Amino acid sequence: MYVMTQSGWLELICGCMFSGKSEELIRRVRRAQFAKQEVKVFKPTIDNRYSEDAVVSHNGNSVIAIPVATPAEMFRYISAATDVVAIDEIQFFSDDIIDVVQTLADCGYRVIAAGLDQDFRGEPFGPVPALMAIAESVTKLQAVCTVCGSPASRTQRLINGAPASYDDPVILVGASEAYEPRCRHHHEVPGKPKKRYNHPLAGHTGE
């Protein structure tokens, strides 16, 4: 990777649940703090699974965060003394987050964002695809499929132990009892529209 000669850029950490996104964000935040940089950490108010005022990884590591309801609220807490802005669960924000992140990066701030790239349906999640396009650096993490042990890129939503229907609400914040990491082949979404094309090699096993 080339060395940045100008300050101000976006680093995006994405992937499915349990892939270590928050853990990686916390690692980068702590590294910046160790370097005596001033860091402001934000999270959406909707994310209160483990804490209302901290980013908490599934491993139990945490860093203090400021909960905000809208992206524009972040500007109230950021000053000229701020070096790094970190944002967790960025998929839960409106598309306004795109302009906020662009503005911060253009003004010379290092922005570290983490979030789900796909919703439980296996479809692009909120503003994350656009953020992936404009980021200087994208780190896509994978978990381990709970069914077969293969690399997992999708999030399986379970309601009373059964796969959630395609028509269920996209946003439903939960933890391990509601979600599992799954690979492409074990990701189940009852009611999901069929693919447009039926590939003639659909029976190909890849072996």
Curated annotation (Swiss-Prot):
The keyword Cytoplasm applies. It is found in: Cytoplasm. Zn(2+) binds at C145, C148, C183, H186. Keywords: ATP-binding, Cytoplasm, DNA synthesis, Kinase, Metal-binding, Nucleotide-binding, Transferase, Zinc. GO terms for molecular function: ATP binding; thymidine kinase activity; zinc ion binding. It is an enzyme of class 2 (transferase). Residues 184-198 have a biased composition (Basic residues). Signal peptide: none annotated. The active site is at E89 (proton acceptor). Its EC number is 2.7.1.21. ATP binds at G15, C16, M17, F18, S19, G20, K21, S22, D88, E89, I90, Q91. InterPro entries: P-loop_NTPase, Thymidine_kinase, Thymidine_kinase_CS. GO terms for cellular component: cytosol. GO terms for biological process: DNA biosynthetic process; thymidine metabolic process. The keyword Zinc applies. It comes from the Bacteria. It catalyses: thymidine + ATP = dTMP + ADP + H(+). Its main location: cytoplasm. Residues 184-207 are annotated as: Disordered. Belongs to the thymidine kinase family. Homotetramer. This is Thymidine kinase. The gene is tdk.
